[in-house]
């Protein structure tokens, strides 16, 4: 599991794209020229940006070679760069930085967010959506299984929180719109939940394990999911998925 799997990621493309659609709807810009899609993945969010601003120069950034290859194939009119978000520098100041479900993987948000704001033109917008599910059973159980099986903690850190991000971005000279939403995704089985998180949050826990260790981990994880996520009357499972949204406009 050394690289991201675009096919597995896109298995839930509608559910993953919905937050991007709702984030984009809150971006208060009519005309933009330069746009960066940070953590563009296979290009599903980049496609939304291109649909809204077909004349814009859009650059997608991702550290995964597989994701970049998929995005280039899907959107040949956009530019895609394989790079670390923290180190990438645009050639010119940007009108919009769009980051859908990517910045949660990076540390030091107290430094990262002001840095991203500095890449914007005056009146430019930083639009961010991050999963806020560190305390949800899906992610708590990852840590519990790893502890049971004596594996090191490989999960990401929790988000800084609404009040912290408001202060960070206000102090960086932004007008801030911030909100939190919980989606309830209908899952047909507990295995479907595993399929979902295997493409994202579970990757760090599995990537250094042998095949037999992965099987043991996933078997125990499945057992614990069954205890935490009961079936609805129709046999479906409701997967609660909180997400944090930020639209910050640079006022300086």
Curated annotation (Swiss-Prot):
Its main location: cytoplasm. Keywords: Cytoplasm, Methyltransferase, S-adenosyl-L-methionine, Transferase. Its EC number is 2.1.1.144. GO terms for biological process: methylation. Signal peptide: none annotated. GO terms for cellular component: cytosol. Pfam families: Methyltransf_25. It catalyses: trans-aconitate + S-adenosyl-L-methionine = (E)-3-(methoxycarbonyl)pent-2-enedioate + S-adenosyl-L-homocysteine. It is an enzyme of class 2 (transferase). It is found in: Cytoplasm. InterPro entries: Methyltransf_25, SAM-dependent_MTases_sf, Trans-aconitate_MeTrfase, Trans_acon_MeTrfase_C. Monomer. PANTHER family: TRANS-ACONITATE 2-METHYLTRANSFERASE, TRANS-ACONITATE 2-METHYLTRANSFERASE-RELATED. Catalyzes the S-adenosylmethionine monomethyl esterification of trans-aconitate at high affinity and of cis-aconitate, isocitrate, and citrate at lower velocities and affinities. This is Trans-aconitate 2-methyltransferase. The gene is tam.
């Amino acid at each position: 599991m050394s690289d991201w799997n675009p096919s597995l990621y896109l298995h839930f493309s509608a559910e993953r794209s919905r937050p991007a659609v709702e984030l984009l709807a809150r971006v208060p810009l009519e005309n933009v020229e330069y746009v960066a899609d940070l953590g563009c993945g296979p290009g599903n969010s980049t496609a939304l940006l291109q649909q809204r601003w077909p004349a814009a120069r859009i650059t997608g950034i991702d550290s995964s070679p597989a994701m970049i290859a998929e995005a280039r194939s899907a959107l040949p009119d956009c530019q895609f760069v394989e790079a670390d978000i923290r180190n990438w520098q645009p050639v010119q100041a940007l009108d919009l930085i769009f980051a859908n479900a990517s910045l949660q993987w990076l540390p030091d948000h107290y430094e990262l967010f002001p840095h991203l704001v500095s890449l914007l033109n005056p009146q430019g917008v930083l639009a961010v959506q991050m999963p806020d599910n560190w305390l949800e059973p899906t992610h708590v159980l990852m840590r519990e299984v790893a502890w049971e099986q004596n594996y090191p903690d490989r999960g990401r850190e929790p988000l800084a929180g609404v009040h912290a991000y408001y202060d960070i971005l206000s102090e960086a000279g932004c007008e801030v719109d911030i909100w939190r939403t919980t989606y309830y995704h209908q899952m047909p089985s507990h295995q479907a939940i595993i399929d979902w998180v295997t493409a994202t949050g579970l990757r760090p826990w599995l990537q250094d394990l042998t095949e037999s260790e992965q099987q043991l981990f996933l078997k125990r994880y499945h057992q614990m999911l069954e205890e935490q996520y009961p079936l609805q009357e129709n046999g479906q499972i409701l997967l609660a998925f909180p997400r944090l949204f930020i639209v910050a406009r640079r006022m300086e």
